[in-house]
């Protein structure tokens, strides 16, 4: 029997995904502050009288006590900080919150932890609820943060090919994830505007709490979406399905009279 078997852990966590199993149990994927992404089982949580009923819904943010079973962690206790269930009442909020959870699930392996990314996700939920931030700009910022956290951050300081120092660029190399100087070959690169280059650089460095201060033009937001969607699609093992929903939402907003 391993040393971790029946070891008890208490950690702050956000529920990024759930799946019903059996009559009263469900699988719950937690993105935790201490243990990273873990798969758990919440026994009896589908019963309305269960103390886990209201704390094991998707988007819930709280403190969870878990122990390691033979194959999964088991949720033993939970204390809710914020359920974020109000996000279910707005299609836009629901879609973006679901996307952030899905992207976190795709980008992080089981047991892989990042306190920084955990803070980004929690902050994003509060910002979505506040409606004080442009949600597209928030999404692009979160994407840049998660790319950097998982080793796919963009290089803004040196040419991706010759390593010459650069301050801005018009072409982004898709394989080496960096700008290309004027002299180097532009094959396997994407042209971007100066404004989009500046936005990428700024959003990569800004704190999540200050995203509400950023104002971007519609053209820049569209180009950011294309660039980051492509980078995410080519670097993670699968493309988030929510991206397609986001595209439909954006198109819907454009066609509003």
UniProtKB/Swiss-Prot annotation:
Keywords per UniProt: DNA damage, DNA recombination, DNA repair
Superkingdom of origin organism: Bacteria
InterPro entries: ARFGAP/RecO, DNA_rep/recomb_RecO_N, NA-bd_OB-fold, RecO, RecO_C
Gene Ontology biological process terms from the UniProt entry: DNA recombination; double-strand break repair
Entry's Gene Ontology cellular component terms: bacterial nucleoid
SUPFAM superfamilies hit by this protein: ArfGap/RecO-like zinc finger, Nucleic acid-binding proteins
Family of the protein in this entry: Belongs to the RecO family.
Protein role: Involved in DNA repair and RecF pathway recombination.
Protein name as catalogued: DNA repair protein RecO
Organism of provenance: Clostridium kluyveri (strain ATCC 8527 / DSM 555 / NBRC 12016 / NCIMB 10680 / K1)
């Amino acid at each position: 029997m391993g040393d971790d078997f029946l070891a008890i852990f208490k950690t702050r966590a956000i529920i990024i995904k759930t799946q019903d199993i059996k009559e009263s149990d469900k699988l719950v994927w937690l993105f935790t502050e201490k243990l990273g992404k873990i798969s758990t089982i919440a026994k009896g949580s589908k019963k309305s009288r269960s103390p886990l009923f209201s704390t094991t819904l998707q988007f819930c943010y709280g403190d969870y006590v878990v122990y390691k079973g033979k194959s999964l962690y088991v949720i033993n206790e939970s204390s809710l900080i914020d359920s974020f269930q109000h996000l279910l009442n707005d299609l836009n909020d629901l879609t973006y919150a679901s996307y952030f959870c899905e992207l976190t699930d795709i980008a992080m392996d089981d047991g892989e932890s990042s306190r920084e990314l955990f803070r980004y996700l929690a902050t994003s939920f509060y910002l979505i609820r506040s409606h004080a931030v442009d949600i597209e700009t928030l999404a692009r910022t979160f994407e840049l943060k998660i790319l950097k956290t998982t080793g796919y951050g963009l290089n803004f300081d040196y040419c991706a090919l010759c390593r010459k120092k650069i301050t801005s660029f018009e072409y982004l190399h898709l394989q080496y994830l960096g700008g290309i100087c004027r002299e180097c070959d532009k094959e396997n690169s994407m042209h971007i505007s100066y404004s989009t280059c500046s936005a990428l650089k700024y959003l990569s460095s800004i704190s999540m709490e200050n995203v509400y201060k950023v104002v971007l033009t519609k053209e820049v937001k569209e180009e950011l979406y294309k660039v980051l969607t492509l980078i995410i699609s080519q670097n993670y093992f699968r493309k988030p399905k929510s991206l397609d929903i986001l595209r439909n939402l954006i198109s819907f907003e454009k066609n509003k009279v």
